[in-house]
Amino acid sequence: MQLYNSLSKTKKTLNKKTINLYCCGPTVYNYIHIGNARPILLVDVLIRYLKSRSIKVNYLQNITDIDDKIILKALENNLNELEVSQKYTSAYLEDLKSLNINQPDKIILISQKMNEMIDFIKNLVDINAAYVLDGDVYFDIKKYENEYCKLSGYKLDELISGKRVEIDSKKHYSLDFSLWKKTDIGIKWDSVFGLGRPGWHTECVLLIDEYFNHQTIDIHVGGIDLKFPHHENERIQFIAKNNKELAHIWLHNGHLQINDEKMSKSLGNVILVRDFIKKHNKNTLRWIFLTTNYTQPLNISDDLIYQANKFFEKLTNLSKKTIQFIIKKDLKIKSINSSEYINKFNEYMEDDLNTSLVLSLIDLLIKQINKNIVDKNLDNFNLLIGSLNYILDVLGFDNVFNYKFDNKTKELFLKWQELVKNKEFNKADLIRNKLIEQGIL
């Protein structure tokens, strides 16, 4: 399988039977919005595909339950930080379920790893990769300036002149970033450096380092907005501590726009996942994300949502026609996992998750199944139905194509046909209403 690696700027081959994967999780101070959902859905589709190819995936995700934003939210609502973080952690897990996203194998709350975090930072200080100043701890970028910014592609002098970093006069170098923050505000822990809490960039790298036993992971996933400084700072800490790369492949998904505008609070166009699902459905967002390569920006327009609705409408109508055809022809449909269509699906997915071509393949299958039904053609019908069902299932679509039914439904449909044939329309209408409720007519 080939995936685009943001570090090398080339597609890289993934050919292992066990994959270690990390994806940045949410900071739990609010409900997640649809932009937050893009990398998580990307991972879900990737893992579902890898598992369909008998590849094992060890998937780790953090939940940042310690952060200035959480403290601010708590102060605004007269709550403590724990109440805020617990509320939105639960909400996040609910949203995953609502989107039919499989939970990671391991989710770790940052607050549960505070001792390990302190030890990790102390280790960086001990090897002179970081320094302590008045209770704060900073990473020493100058020691690793030949490695720093290889992921983002920035040049150090451009970052300084462009003010892409915080100005702090007490730091050795303006690009040095915080590993431990001395503070009297909000939740804090005692450490060898004094009272404070860890910096955000250390939280993720600590979990990767510990959970995957100090080894380079196969895939690191996150939004392109996190490439600098967050992922850059994760990477440099791991290199400093372990003298090796953090990840073989860095996957970054592109920005999200809403009707050609950046999604932002100031524009008032931020769409929460739960609000989107209420208005549309859980499958709509998945389809929208699959229309464009994950590395590219994606504009969610009213027209794109309309296209998504038409897609699911086609599948609903196809489900009805398929069930009717199977009953009329008394067919037995078997599940399959191999066909020319599935081979083509695998080919597209192996090429950096080319999901736009996969959606075209699904459209082709829908047209071919419809043609077979119209022509009353049984040739390859099981293969077509099985292929479509297999592909939709691997992509994670939930209950969008249904061709299965029980004997009671079959008997009801045949009875309805008989009544119509005998022109007993009043009785037929009673059964027809039941079949409509069941999604058969």
Curated annotation (Swiss-Prot):
Its EC number is 6.1.1.16. GO terms for cellular component: cytosol. The keyword Ligase applies. It is found in: Cytoplasm. ATP binds at K265. The keyword Ligase applies. A motif ('KMSKS' region) lies at residues 262-266. Its cofactor is Zn(2+). This is Cysteine--tRNA ligase. Zn(2+) binds at C24, C204, H230, E234. SUPFAM superfamilies: Anticodon-binding domain of a subclass of class I aminoacyl-tRNA synthetases, Nucleotidylyl transferase. Belongs to the class-I aminoacyl-tRNA synthetase family. Gene3D superfamilies: Cysteine-tRNA ligase, C-terminal anti-codon recognition domain, HUPs. Monomer. A motif ('HIGH' region) lies at residues 26-36. GO terms for biological process: cysteinyl-tRNA aminoacylation. Keywords: Aminoacyl-tRNA synthetase, ATP-binding, Cytoplasm, Ligase, Metal-binding, Nucleotide-binding, Protein biosynthesis, Zinc. Binds 1 zinc ion per subunit. It catalyses: tRNA(Cys) + L-cysteine + ATP = L-cysteinyl-tRNA(Cys) + AMP + diphosphate. One of its GO terms (molecular function) is cysteine-tRNA ligase activity. InterPro entries: Cys-tRNA-ligase, Cys-tRNA-synt_Ia_DALR, Cys-tRNA/MSH_ligase, Rossmann-like_a/b/a_fold, tRNA-synt_1_cat_dom, tRNAsynth_Ia_anticodon-bd.
